[in-house]
């Protein structure tokens, strides 16, 4: 029993010393933070609503959940598998001086997955057969 307690104390002390540097993130924390999942990103309103560029909005950017992160294979990419529309109220101002609250719709990513990358391949050209003389 004393041996078991001694081993347990040694393991705990070892873990404590490994984690003593608070600036170092452990492998599992790094892995979890890099996985393919929806994460908040700041997007300019003009990027999602280019048809409204004649207006200015306050705030000019919104925070949306978008897929991001890494896949464990270079041939895969992190893409949305489920999306949802969300409405947000923004203060809009046009060049004519009219101001008011506007409700705009944005797309958020609900679920993400690693899927094969679709690379564009150059078009193949076929030559007509050569005639023999």
Swiss-Prot record:
<dbReference type="InterPro" id="IPR050507">
    <property type="entry name" value="PDGF/VEGF_growth_factor"/>
</dbReference>
<dbReference type="InterPro" id="IPR000072">
    <property type="entry name" value="PDGF/VEGF_dom"/>
</dbReference>
<protein>
    <recommendedName>
        <fullName>Vascular endothelial growth factor homolog</fullName>
    </recommendedName>
</protein>
<keyword id="KW-0339">Growth factor</keyword>
<feature type="signal peptide">
    <location>
        <begin position="1"/>
        <end position="20"/>
    </location>
</feature>
<dbReference type="GO" id="GO:0008083">
    <property type="term" value="F:growth factor activity"/>
</dbReference>
<dbReference type="GO" id="GO:0060754">
    <property type="term" value="P:positive regulation of mast cell chemotaxis"/>
</dbReference>
<dbReference type="GO" id="GO:0005172">
    <property type="term" value="F:vascular endothelial growth factor receptor binding"/>
</dbReference>
<comment type="function">
    <text>Induces endothelial proliferation.</text>
</comment>
<dbReference type="GO" id="GO:0005615">
    <property type="term" value="C:extracellular space"/>
</dbReference>
<feature type="disulfide bond">
    <location>
        <begin position="67"/>
        <end position="112"/>
    </location>
</feature>
<feature type="glycosylation site" description="N-linked (GlcNAc...) asparagine; by host">
    <location>
        <position position="85"/>
    </location>
</feature>
<keyword id="KW-0732">Signal</keyword>
<dbReference type="GO" id="GO:0045766">
    <property type="term" value="P:positive regulation of angiogenesis"/>
</dbReference>
<dbReference type="InterPro" id="IPR029034">
    <property type="entry name" value="Cystine-knot_cytokine"/>
</dbReference>
<feature type="disulfide bond">
    <location>
        <begin position="36"/>
        <end position="78"/>
    </location>
</feature>
<dbReference type="GO" id="GO:0050930">
    <property type="term" value="P:induction of positive chemotaxis"/>
</dbReference>
<dbReference type="GO" id="GO:0051781">
    <property type="term" value="P:positive regulation of cell division"/>
</dbReference>
<comment type="subunit">
    <text>Homodimer; disulfide-linked.</text>
</comment>
<dbReference type="GO" id="GO:0016020">
    <property type="term" value="C:membrane"/>
</dbReference>
<keyword id="KW-1015">Disulfide bond</keyword>
<feature type="disulfide bond">
    <location>
        <begin position="71"/>
        <end position="114"/>
    </location>
</feature>
<comment type="similarity">
    <text>Belongs to the PDGF/VEGF growth factor family.</text>
</comment>
<keyword id="KW-0325">Glycoprotein</keyword>
<dbReference type="Pfam" id="PF00341">
    <property type="entry name" value="PDGF"/>
</dbReference>
<dbReference type="GO" id="GO:0042056">
    <property type="term" value="F:chemoattractant activity"/>
</dbReference>
<dbReference type="GO" id="GO:0001666">
    <property type="term" value="P:response to hypoxia"/>
</dbReference>
<dbReference type="InterPro" id="IPR023581">
    <property type="entry name" value="PD_growth_factor_CS"/>
</dbReference>
<dbReference type="GO" id="GO:0001938">
    <property type="term" value="P:positive regulation of endothelial cell proliferation"/>
</dbReference>
<keyword id="KW-0497">Mitogen</keyword>
<keyword id="KW-0964">Secreted</keyword>
């Amino acid at each position: 029993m004393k041996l078991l307690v001694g081993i347990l104390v040694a393991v705990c002390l070892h873990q404590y010393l490994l984690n003593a540097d608070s600036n170092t993130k452990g492998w599992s924390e790094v892995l979890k933070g890099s996985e393919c999942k929806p994460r908040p990103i700041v997007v300019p309103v003009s990027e999602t609503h280019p048809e409204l560029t004649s207006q200015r909005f306050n705030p000019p950017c919104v925070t949306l959940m978008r897929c991001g992160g890494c896949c464990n294979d270079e041939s895969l990419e992190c893409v949305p598998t489920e999306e949802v529309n969300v409405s947000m109220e923004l203060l809009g101002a046009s060049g004519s001086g009219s101001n008011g609250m506007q409700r705009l719709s944005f797309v958020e990513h609900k679920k993400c997955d690693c899927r094969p990358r679709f690379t564009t391949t150059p078009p193949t050209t076929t030559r007509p057969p050569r005639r023999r003389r």
